[in-house]
Amino acid sequence: MKNTIDQKAREGYALELGKLIDDSFATFKKTFLVSGLGMLIVSAIMVLFYIGLMGSFFGFSNLSKTVLSIETLAKEPNFIIGSGIVSMFVSALFAPFTAGFIHLNHLAQTQKSFSIDNLFDFYKEPYYKQIFLSYLIIGGITALFTTMLSLFGYEKINTFVQIIFSLATIFTIPLIIYGKLDYTEALSKSVQLYAKQPLIILVAMLIAVIGMLLGIFILCIGIIFTVPYLYAMHYALYAQAIGFEKTAPENQEL
């Protein structure tokens, strides 16, 4: 598999936008209910985590006062730097959930059984360490750039920087869990692979965002159940760009 990845990173690969849309929607239809319920659970965990984090720094006695304290400190250099560091570790801590959401699509595509339990599969070794370290680096670099921009008064560019880093590292998790690369190789190859088809990848993810929003307004279902379409497109991109070996991880083998 490593030879295939090296070849694609070196010579390039083909992506068909129409097929990406068809494939992503096909797996989304199979996984949206489980993924949506999983998103509820993960969102609840993150909310509790952030409440605990804010409470440990600002106290639990008055939540509204805590929010006001954060708003007051938001432009303080020390707070900006501190929040960047916290964001870096939080993104790394929750990254295995991203792997779980992506993997649900693989299980559906390969006609394997899946459940909410599969969202926690990549908190196990050998995957957890590699995913955690990769997103610690991604989060660290992103936090460095966004913190510097904020300190110099260019907060409006932060979103653009975050989008660029997200797209350039889009293949990192699939390369770890399916390509069996370590975190340094996965990061490097992801950037190389993205550079071969940047426009189509950007358009595909933009379509995924639009599809997510249309699902909210047209189908009248909550964003919790439409966000997983982003992971379906994420999976479709890797599946079409790289593909899989028969030994790719299944829920029974983890």
Regions found by a protein language model. Give the residues of each.
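Outer-membrane beta-barrel domain signature
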Residues: 39, 45-58, 63-64, 146-154, ...
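Selective recognition of hydrophobic, aromatic-rich stretches within alpha-helical transmembrane segments
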Residues: 2-4, 77-112, 143-182, 216-247
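Membrane-interface interhelical connector segments
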Residues: 72, 109-122
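A general structural signal for short secondary-structure boundary/capping elements
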Residues: 56-57, 238-239, 252-253
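Short, small/hydrophobic-residue-rich motifs at membrane-helix boundaries and re-entrant hairpins
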Residues: 7-22, 26, 30-110, 139
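Interfacial aromatic "cap" segments that immediately flank transmembrane helices
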Residues: 14-45, 116-144, 165-216, 254
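Cytosolic juxtamembrane C-terminal amphipathic helix followed by a basic/polar low-complexity tail immediately after
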Residues: 4-6, 12, 16, 244-254
